C-alpha cells in the first residue's frame, strides 16, 4: 500500500505542463491535464495511482498508510540486522521470467511482479537489477 501511495503522490506532478508527456490536442490547462494523463499513463499505472489515492484519502490514511509506515520501520530494522552479517541480499528481480508485451493483464498478477523489488524501495537501500540469464522459454530473467 505504501508504494501505491507514494506513486500516486509522486506522479501527481506529471501534468503535461511541467513534467511528463504532453498531449498535443488539448486547448486549455484542464484539458491538458486530463488528456496528458489519460494518454501518458497506461492502465497499470492508472490502477496504482487510484489505489494510492485511496490509501491517502481521509478515513483510510490511518488504516493503511500509517500502519504501512510502521511495517516499513520493522522491515528497515530487520534489513539492517541482516546487513550486520551479510554484504548483499540477492533476490530474483521478479517471480517469473519476463513476459511478452500485453501477455499479462490481470492486475493482481501485475502487482505481484513487484514483490521482490519493493523491498529496496521500502527500506531505502540501493538496488540494481542485472540480467542473469535466459529461461528455456526464451525469456530473460534477472537478479537484484
Regions found by a protein language model. Name each.
Residues 3-9, 13, 18-144:
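Glycine-rich, small-residue loops and helix-cap segments
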Amino acid at each position: 500500500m505504501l508504494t501505491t501511495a507514494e506513486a500516486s503522490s509522486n506522479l501527481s506532478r506529471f501534468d503535461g505542463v511541467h513534467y511528463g508527456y504532453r498531449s498535443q490536442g488539448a486547448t486549455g490547462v484542464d484539458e491538458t491535464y486530463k488528456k496528458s494523463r489519460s494518454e501518458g499513463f497506461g492502465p497499470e499505472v492508472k490502477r496504482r495511482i487510484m489505489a494510492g489515492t485511496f490509501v491517502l484519502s481521509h478515513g483510510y490514511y490511518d488504516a493503511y498508510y500509517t500502519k504501512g509506515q510502521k511495517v516499513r520501520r520493522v522491515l528497515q530494522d530487520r534489513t539492517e540486522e541482516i546487513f550486520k552479517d551479510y554484504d548483499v541480499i540477492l533476490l530474483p528481480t521478479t517471480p517469473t521470467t519476463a513476459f511478452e508485451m500485453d501477455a499479462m493483464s490481470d492486475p493482481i498478477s501485475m502487482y505481484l511482479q513487484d514483490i521482490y523489488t519493493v523491498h529496496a524501495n521500502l527500506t531505502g537501500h540501493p538496488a540494481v537489477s542485472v540480467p542473469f540469464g535466459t529461461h528455456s522459454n526464451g525469456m530473460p530473467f534477472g537478479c537484484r
